[in-house]
C-alpha cells in the first residue's frame, strides 16, 4: 500500500496569479466552463464556470501576465483595460486538495485581478482548441450577469469572486 505524505499547508506558499474579468458592451461578464481534470482543484464539483486566470511567469508583471493568459485561454485580443483591483486576493485550497492540486507545490493562490472591456465579436473567442497550441481549459463559454458569478465558481473560490464583483461592480452599469 503506497504511503501518503502529510503536507502542512502552512509550509506552502501561495501561487502568484492573475484573474481577468472581461465585460462586453452590455456589461455582461465572460465565463468559461472548466474541463475538470482528475487531481485538479475542480475534481468532483459541478460548479465549473470561471473567469480566465493563470500564473505569473518569472520576471513578468501582473498586467503582462493577464494579457498573456487572456489570449492563451480565450484567443481574445480586442480588449482595453478598465480597472485593476486595489489589493491582491488570496484563497486556500480545501484540505483534501492540499498537496495534490497545483502539483502539490502551493496552498492556494494569491491573485491580482484586472477588468477589461471586450470590443470584438464571438468569432474572436477560441477555447477548444485555444490559439498557440495551448491546452484547452474550457469546453464552452457564456456571457453572464456579474452578480451571478459567485454562484458559478467552486465553493472555495466564492469569497474571491465576491471581492472581485465588489471591486468591479461599477463597471457593469
Curated annotation (Swiss-Prot):
Gene Ontology MF terms: bis(5'-adenosyl)-pentaphosphatase activity; guanosine-3',5'-bis(diphosphate) 3'-diphosphatase activity
EC annotation from Swiss-Prot or TrEMBL: 3.6.1.-
Alphabetized UniProt keyword annotations: Hydrolase
Source organism, top-level taxon: Bacteria
Short sequence motif Nudix box: positions: 54-75
Cofactor(s) needed: a divalent metal cation
SUPFAM superfamilies, per database record: Nudix (SSF55811)
Functional summary from the UniProt entry: Accelerates the degradation of transcripts by removing pyrophosphate from the 5'-end of triphosphorylated RNA, leading to a more labile monophosphorylated state that can stimulate subsequent ribonuclease cleavage.
Similarity-based family: Belongs to the Nudix hydrolase family. RppH subfamily.
NCBIfam families: PRK00714.1-5
Protein name: RNA pyrophosphohydrolase
Lineage: Bacteria, Pseudomonadati, Pseudomonadota, Alphaproteobacteria, Hyphomicrobiales
Amino acid at each position: 500500500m503506497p504511503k501518503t505524505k502529510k503536507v502542512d499547508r502552512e509550509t506552502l506558499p501561495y501561487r502568484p496569479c492573475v484573474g481577468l474579468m472581461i465585460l462586453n458592451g452590455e456589461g455582461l461578464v465572460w465565463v468559461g466552463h472548466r474541463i475538470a481534470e482528475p487531481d485538479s482543484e475542480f475534481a468532483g464539483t459541478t460548479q465549473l464556470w470561471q473567469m480566465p486566470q493563470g500564473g505569473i511567469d518569472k520576471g513578468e508583471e501582473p498586467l503582462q501576465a493577464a494579457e498573456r493568459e487572456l489570449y492563451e485561454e480565450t484567443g481574445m485580443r480586442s480588449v482595453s483595460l478598465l480597472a485593476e483591483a486595489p489589493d491582491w486576493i488570496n484563497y486556500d485550497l480545501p484540505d483534501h486538495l492540499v498537496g495534490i492540486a497545483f502539483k502539490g507545490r502551493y496552498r492556494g493562490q494569491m491573485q491580482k485581478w484586472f477588468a477589461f472591456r471586450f470590443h470584438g465579436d464571438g468569432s474572436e473567442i477560441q477555447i477548444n482548441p485555444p490559439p498557440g497550441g495551448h491546452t484547452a481549459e474550457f469546453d464552452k463559454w457564456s456571457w453572464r450577469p456579474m452578480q451571478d458569478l459567485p454562484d458559478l465558481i467552486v465553493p472555495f473560490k466564492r469569497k474571491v469572486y465576491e471581492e472581485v464583483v465588489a471591486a468591479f461592480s461599477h463597471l457593469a452599469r
